Every structure is written in C-alpha cells, then in structure tokens.
C-alpha cells in the first residue's frame, strides 16, 4: 500500500491526504481509509462544512494536536470536498513519522 503522505526532504514539507467527516461528536484522527486505491488519514471534525468552518477547524486541530504553527498548515486541494490534500511546511521527517505512527495500528 502507498503512503497517505508524500514528504519532500529538501523543502521539509509534506503533502498529506485526508478523508474528513464533519459534524462529528469530537475532533479525532483515526487510522486510515483507502478510496480509489489511494490511502487517506481519517479525520473527524466537530464543525459543520459551512462557510469554511470545518476547514478552519481542521487547521486548528492539526496545529494543536501536532504542536505546529497554523501558518505552516494549508489546505491545497478539496476546500469544498471531504477528501483533502494538506500541505504542512517546516516539519522534520522524523517528527512526521512519530506523529503518523501514533495513529497507525
């Protein structure tokens, strides 16, 4: 299986595939799902998908959970869809692997 992220070591950034479920009971990352042979990290978000609320909560949640600056996290694809691509800048590959491995069982 392919990874649900693509790390660029020269730029210290990662493209991360997310499958987001808005209107959830809690904000939670839980394992992964495969859609059209592409793996995605599953993310449940409490916010509604209206006027960018869910997208804003995704950035806030990831920044807080992973101890990253909000300015280093950007949704680059899927602004109005539940399948999203996230760009995270200024992240060390070892730290990224530590984060990812904490969700994969």
UniProtKB/Swiss-Prot annotation:
Pfam families: DUF167 (PF02594). Disulfide bonds: none annotated. Gene3D superfamilies: YggU-like. SUPFAM superfamilies: YggU-like (SSF69786). NCBIfam families: DUF167 family protein (TIGR00251), PRK01530.1 (NF002419). Belongs to the UPF0235 family. This is UPF0235 protein A1C_06510. It comes from Rickettsia akari (strain Hartford).
